[in-house]
């Protein structure tokens, strides 16, 4: 009798019941604990590193961490189905915030410029950076769209996803904020691969992007071109840029090398950082501070924690049971890992300085809270898995 009643239920209700059963029986046994642990480790390491140079900011960062954990607790308790249902609305609201940043007649008291960039909306005593949260809402929107196989198998479908992705990218570039904008392309490629897009379609898009990338150089801001020029000059051994356009990169490499294997310690590291005059040492260049204070061991710890976060996210996607959950997890993992890759690469002189922050580690309330909300989404997906694999869920 029970079987007959169960089979007579609508398919969506049977799927929901299967999901709820899995959530209640194995809610505490899933891979999302690995990203949670890695995120907590990175957050605490970041607070300690910030305290090396700016003790007052370390206290504020701890407060941001508490807010992030509370928000994560709320989001993680929600079912991922409402995230799929409202994904496009959340994305549209975030895009509207990005447009609002570029409206010329909005007073500086509301949209607060910093170093010539309009990235922050003033909310009382705090500043909110929409580009941090749009990364998550974009992943949710793309996952909601790409979960249907018909979308990704056609070249027109791939082009449509690229056009949608170009909207937040263009708005972020106009702020200007090149570092955040460059994350979307590789993350979209990974999500398309996970969704089952044809390799020849992705190869065509990748080739076009590689051909057009050098053509964008003349359209970059002057400081962005200077950073690229400085990298090439340093690679060629031209030290004349070390006191000019390559000053920040040179100081970062010098400080990172000063830590040696085990680090210089808090007092000596603080002195080295002070006299080397490293710009943005608590935000963009926090990895240099970690390498200086804790040496190669600290740098490796950042990489291990970052890789652990990405691996845990990919495992959540592999075991999600739904295409939506798989794509969200893969998108989140690739976004966070790529950000870590670019930040550490620019700090040790392998990539041009872009101003990209180190996830969970760099000082900043918007970034830290948004990243913890993102981690909570992984937790929601992992703790409410569907039995088998359901393309429609």
Protein language model features and the residues they cover:
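A juxtamembrane structural motif centered on a specific transmembrane helix
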Residues: 2-17, 338-393
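N-terminal membrane topogenic signal
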Residues: 22-39
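Hydrophobic alpha-helical transmembrane segments of multi-pass inner membrane proteins, especially
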Residues: 35-248, 284, 288-348, 373-377, ...
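Re-entrant/interfacial helical elements at transmembrane boundaries that shape
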Residues: 183-184, 267-274, 305, 347-355, ...
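Residue-level "hotspot" positions that anchor or transmit function at local structural transition points
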Residues: 243, 277-278, 369
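Extracytosolic (periplasmic/ER-lumenal) interhelical loops and adjacent juxtamembrane/interface segments
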Residues: 246-266
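Long extracytoplasmic/lumenal interhelical loops at the membrane interface
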Residues: 261-297
């Amino acid at each position: 009798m029970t079987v007959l009643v169960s089979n007579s239920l609508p398919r969506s209700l049977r799927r929901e019941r299967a999901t709820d059963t899995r959530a209640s029986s194995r809610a505490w046994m899933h891979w999302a604990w690995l990203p949670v642990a890695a995120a907590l480790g990175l957050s605490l390491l970041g607070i300690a590193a910030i305290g090396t140079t700016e003790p007052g900011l370390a206290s504020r960062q701890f407060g941001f961490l508490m807010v992030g954990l509370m928000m994560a607790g709320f989001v993680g308790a929600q079912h991922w189905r409402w995230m799929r249902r409202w994904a496009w609305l959340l994305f549209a609201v975030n895009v509207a915030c990005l447009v609002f940043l570029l409206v010329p007649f909005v007073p500086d008291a509301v949209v607060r410029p910093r170093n010539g960039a309009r990235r922050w909306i003033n909310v009382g005593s705090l500043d909110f950076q929409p580009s941090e949260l749009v990364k998550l809402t974009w992943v949710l929107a793309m996952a909601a769209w790409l979960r249907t196989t018909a979308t990704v198998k056609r070249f027109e479908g791939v082009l449509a996803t690229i056009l949608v992705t170009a909207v937040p990218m263009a708005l972020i570039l106009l702020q200007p904020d090149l570092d955040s904008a460059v994350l979307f392309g590789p993350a979209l490629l990974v999500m398309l691969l996970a969704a089952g897009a044809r390799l020849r379609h992705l190869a065509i898009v990748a080739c076009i992007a590689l051909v057009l990338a050098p053509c964008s150089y003349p359209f970059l801001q002057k400081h962005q071109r200077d950073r690229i020029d400085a990298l090439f000059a340093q690679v060629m051994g031209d030290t004349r840029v070390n006191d000019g356009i390559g000053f920040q990169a040179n100081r970062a490499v010098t400080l990172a090398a000063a830590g040696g294997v085990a680090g210089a310690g808090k007092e000596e590291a603080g002195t080295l950082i002070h006299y080397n005059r490293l710009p943005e040492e608590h935000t963009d260049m926090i990895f240099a501070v970690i390498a200086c204070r804790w040496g190669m061991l600290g740098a490796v710890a950042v990489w291990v924690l970052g890789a652990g976060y990405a691996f845990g996210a990919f495992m959540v996607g592999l075991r999600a049971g739904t295409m939506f959950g798989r794509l969200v997890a893969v998108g989140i993992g690739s976004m966070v890992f790529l950000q870590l890759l670019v930040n550490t690469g620019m700090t040790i002189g392998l990539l041009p300085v872009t101003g990209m922050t180190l996830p969970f580690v760099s000082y900043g309330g918007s970034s830290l809270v948004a990243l913890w909300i993102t981690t909570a989404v992984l937790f929601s997906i992992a703790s409410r898995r569907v039995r088998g694999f359901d393309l429609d869920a």
